[in-house]
Amino acid sequence: MKSKINIPVIGNGDVSNKNDYMKIKKHTNCDGVMIGRASLGNPWIFKELTDDNYNSLDRNIMDIVDICEKHFILLKKYKEERVCLNLTKKHFSWYLKGFNNASEWRKKFLKSKSIDDVVIALDEMKDSYYS
């Protein structure tokens, strides 16, 4: 199909790792690949696709804590409190998926009613993993 048209073709659907990406590129010869849900909780997927030396298995809970903190700082800066809290709950749940004690931390963030609650939970999470 790609060979019969003169416009860029973008592949899409169920691309959650480099192997999926390579399969769709090889099978379709598309010009690009769209990544959606696979990036939720895994912003590292883009590094995995572009850096042959990156191994997603090397990621650990410290990386998750760091990304939660960075993401929260940006949400506080650019979003009003209600939106910040809702997005924090959504994204932190994705980030924590699959890690030890994930449900405990997810519950703490989901119960947050203010920016201060999130800050306290983030500090507790950092302390528990960095000490």
Predicted features by range, described:
Residues 2-11, 15-131:
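Alpha/beta catalytic cores of nucleotide-metabolism and tRNA/nucleoside-modifying enzymes
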